[in-house]
Structures are given as structure tokens and as C-alpha cells.
A protein has these predicted regions:
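A broad, low-specificity signal marking well-ordered, structured residues that form hydrophobic/aromatic
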Residues: 15, 109, 136
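Residues that flank catalytic or metal-binding motifs in active/ligand-binding sites
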Residues: 86, 107, 134
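Short leucine-rich amphipathic alpha-helical surface patches
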Residues: 91-94, 115
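Intrinsically disordered, low-complexity, charged/polar segments
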Residues: 124-145
Length: 145
């Protein structure tokens, strides 16, 4: 399942950013990227409804962690950084809440995410650029393997 999550996320690389976008090659947001990837590989319950997470700027004005609440409702559980494996999910605190989400690609901290400047792309989730120094929370949708 972990490899399937990473493989599906890679198929979105190069898709431009679009707030709440959902079409591969046309436009995707960070939240919809994660939702569509985990839905495609059936890592969330069948029939799980599409999230109604945010207005794109909610993290700037609200302390509610709506994306985390949604992932937990799908069966996600929080894990320690030492437990993180490829295919897990990382949330970054941006503004007042955890308003950015990405998929862990490898043991080195590489993630796939979607941002306005680069669209769906790779980034190092801890050491460089937009994501460096951000408070992080990690979650998994995968049971014991």
C-alpha cells in the first residue's frame, strides 16, 4: 500500500496548482492531491466523501485543523517522526493551523505536495525552501505491515 501511495502521487508531478483543484494535468491543491491519491489506491474507506476542508486561506485566520480532522475521520492516526515511512502524510503549520499537507516519498524527507509557485512537485520536507523550519505533524493511513 505504501508503494502504491507514492507511485500514484508521482503521477501528479507537473500538474499546476489550483486552489481546490482536482484534475490531473490541469490543476490540484495540496489537500485534494492527498485525498485523490489515497482514494485512488483505496487507502481510505470505500464511499468516503470528498473533504470540504478549507477556503484555501483558512489556515491564516483559523486555529481549526480541518484537514487533520478529516484525515482522522478516514482512519488516519498520528505517529511520531521516528515512525514515518514512505506513503505517510505530513502536515505543516502555516499560519494559525496545520494548513499544508504532503505525502512522504522516502526516508530522506522528500515529499510530494502542491503549491502555487511549483504546482505538484517534489520538495525536501524539512531542510529547504517553503517547508523548512515549519512545525510538523505526521499521520499514517496504513495499519501494521
Amino acid at each position: 500500500m505504501r508503494a502504491a501511495i507514492v507511485a500514484e502521487a508521482k503521477t501528479w508531478i507537473g500538474t499546476p496548482y489550483k486552489a481546490v483543484g482536482r484534475i490531473k494535468g490541469v490543476g490540484i491543491s495540496c489537500a485534494m492531491l492527498v485525498y485523490l491519491v489515497v482514494r485512488a489506491v483505496r487507502a481510505i474507506p470505500e464511499g468516503a466523501t470528498e473533504p470540504k476542508w478549507y477556503s484555501g486561506q483558512v489556515h491564516l485566520n483559523s486555529t481549526e485543523d480541518r484537514m487533520i480532522d478529516c484525515l482522522v475521520a478516514y482512519g488516519g492516526r498520528e505517529i511520531a517522526e521516528a515512525e514515518v515511512r514512505p506513503g505517510d502524510i505530513v502536515f505543516y503549520k502555516t499560519g494559525l493551523s496545520f494548513g499544508h499537507i504532503a505525502i512522504i516519498v522516502d526516508w530522506l524527507g522528500t515529499v510530494i505536495h502542491a503549491i502555487p509557485k511549483n504546482g505538484c512537485s517534489y520538495a525536501h520536507g524539512t531542510r529547504e525552501g517553503l517547508l523548512s523550519g515549519k512545525l510538523r505533524r505526521y499521520f499514517t493511513l496504513i495499519g501494521d505491515e
